[in-house]
Amino acid sequence: KNVPNALSGTSACAFYLVPPIDSKDANIIYINNNRVESNEMFSTLAHEGYPGHLYQTNYFLSTNPSPLRTFLHCDGYDEGWGTYAQLYSYNFTEFKDVDEKTQAQLRQLYRDNDLLSLSLSSLSDLYVNYKNYDENALADYLKTYGIDKSATKQLYQYVIENPVTYLSYSIGYYELNKLEKEMAASLGKSFKISDFHEAVLNVGSCNFAILSQEIEKETEILSKIP
């Protein structure tokens, strides 16, 4: 659905509404057309829909968890998975009239661009809310990356109104990426990315200390499979 015009100025680019536990089929994604360009729709829907939040939520609900778990959410896990799914989805993008090597490079370019944008936003959040940067100081920092004053003003206002929000996306992603690498290193040639995804989704939303313990247990189980 489209975000109503009256709310578009303050709404996020897109968001997924978690369905009630007694109405699991009510899965709705809202798109803010004033903030999402058509060429961003693929990654946006990957983050909010499949294999992002919508898939994550419905997968976990299919495990028949305690109803209490539906109230317990950790933003780092949730937005980390959404970002992980968004970046992973580029593995399935196709570009016209390019060879395999160029296609792989373009996919990586899209991932790197998303990560750079997210990392700069997260650093801006820290500089403003922790190091007390004012708008001019932030503009001086961001202009070295080609970001103009208009974009800086919007970002400055956002991180003031929503402190540490960006960090749940960036740190959440990097935590998941670290766990994936650790599992891959432990299992070697027997590592399958689907096993990692399943292990993460089976645990559900939690802090990374718990998730790390559960991934370690699953890794030990998988290592004993001949």
Predicted regions located by residue number:
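Long, His/Glu/Asp-enriched segments that create or flank divalent metal/ion-associated functional microenvironments
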Residues: 1-226
